[in-house]
Amino acid sequence: EKEEYIAKNKQVIAEHVIPAYSEMISGLTKLLGCGRNDWGLCNYEDGKSYYEALVAYNTGTDFTVDELFQQIADARQEDVDICTTILASNPKLASMDIKLDSQLTDENAMIDHLKKAITKDFPKACDTTSEITHVDESLSEYLAPAFYITAPIDDYSTNRIYINNANNYTDLYYFTTLAHEGYPGHLYQTCLSYSYGYEPVRCLLSYPGYVEGWATYVEMMAYDYAGL
């Protein structure tokens, strides 16, 4: 049944999806230069209300836009105050060259290290494999620095993370990024949720604030896992 499904998907992509994208590219190319709105959503009727709805959907809260802006401003100010206090007590920190352990310069080694390191804070990860793939150069300009491809609900034994080499990021950046996308971030959260009896209907729904909130939170913990 799975093989039939895979074959059908390939057929649909070849006969419908790719031709549809080709037609869309052609149509959008013809429209280049005819746009009359340089102000985004706010310049459309009910644009403000639509934006507010998007904010609520993507954050998962009922805070107003102004309240969210204030929360962000308060958090940033708190971070600045903390950094100022730390630098005042140790000015040399500003010029320190922070580097990862030489054994953690390989992406697969980073994933293996993170998978073990998180056990002091979180339940043991599922028995899964992680494949790290590099974004094709033709797409590097348009894609995020990294992203996790959500595993199928019926088979989360193999997972894939894409890394974009468009920018010359440091090893520490890649380490924290792999924590965000891998362990204990998106990959870990997805597989553990599945193993605990994730309700299938949730695979049809989107919780961007909850999912990205978790990954961003644990990304900050990665500095500790890196031994810094």
Stretches found by the model and what they are:
Residues E1-L228:
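N-terminal maturation segment of proteins
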